[in-house]
Amino acid sequence: MNDTPQTLEKDVRDNLLLLYDFDKDYDVKLLKYSENVIFKITFKEAFPVVLRIHRPGYHNIEELEGEILWMDEIHRDTDVELPVVYRGRDGRFLQKMTTFSGEEVYVSVISFLEGSPLGELKDDELIKGLESLGEITAKLHMQSINRDKIGRAHV
């Protein structure tokens, strides 16, 4: 990606309301700038969301859509707490945005889930978190087995 975090933040500010039906009063904060660029969008009158700018050329549109559709299925079919994926104004999960440098990128928006980085947890919290991770992994394993049985494609 040829854009800086600052120009991408401006791109998000300029395009968010064109792509999604969100409240006009919001704040944008960069959370992570790496292979994907992640912004937290905080609204005055609604719950925060996360906007992800997907790294261009890393995954094609079918792979990105597959990942999002699987998240949506997991959310619907299990009790695993996952972010809700938001659809854009056009009804699609993935939206195309042109950056300041002219590069076309895909963006997606999910609900924000509170959490703490693993490195900040105390030992007892870490053990509890890892036990929970094991339970979630088992549920995801069962969901993927059931997904295969009903003929849903692999992501």
Region annotations inferred by a language model:
Residues T4-T7, D11, V37, Y58, ...:
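N-proximal short alpha-helices
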Residues M1-V28:
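Juxta-kinase regulatory segment immediately upstream of eukaryotic protein kinase catalytic domains
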Residues K44-D148:
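ATP-binding pocket architecture of kinase catalytic cores
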Residues V12-R13, S34-V37, E67:
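Short N-terminal amphipathic alpha-helix/helix-capping patch enriched in small hydrophobics
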Residues A153-V155:
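Conserved small/polar residues in nucleotide/adenosyl-binding loops
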Residues Y20-F43:
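ATP-binding glycine-rich phosphate-binding loop
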Residues Q6-T7, K32, E104, E131:
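Alpha-helix N-cap/helix-start motif at coil-to-helix transitions, marked by capping-box chemistry
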